[in-house]
Amino acid sequence: MSAITRHGDALVIRLYIQPKASRDQIVGLHGDELKVAITAPPVDGQANAHLTKFLAKQFRVAKSLVVIEKGELGRHKQIRITHPQHIPADVADFIE
């Protein structure tokens, strides 16, 4: 399975999260997932909230359009971004 797939007007992205990183960034592929480093610690949902905000900014959508479908409590997540207005260059290469 690919890290990023299109489902109608949405993107479904399989992620591997690295919390407590030095900066927020999309790192690249990690196996069959897209690795994302975020600065927030994995405590009380802070990392999930920060991830949602970061991805919303990268794809230029409202935070409510970024939904964690699977993996709320782990590093491996599946998210859905509805109506992305912008596809970051480092992500576009991995879309199937």
Curated annotation (Swiss-Prot):
SMART domains: DUF167
Gene3D superfamilies referenced in this protein's UniProt entry, alphabetically: YggU-like
One Pfam match: DUF167
UniProt-listed InterPro entries: DUF167, YggU-like_sf
GO cellular component: cytoplasm
Intrachain S-S bonds: none
Similarity section: Belongs to the UPF0235 family.
NCBIfam families documented for this protein: DUF167 family protein, PRK05090.1
Protein name (Swiss-Prot/TrEMBL): UPF0235 protein PC1_3453
Species per Swiss-Prot/TrEMBL record: Pectobacterium carotovorum subsp. carotovorum (strain PC1)
Highest classification ranks of the organism: Bacteria, Pseudomonadati, Pseudomonadota, Gammaproteobacteria, Enterobacterales
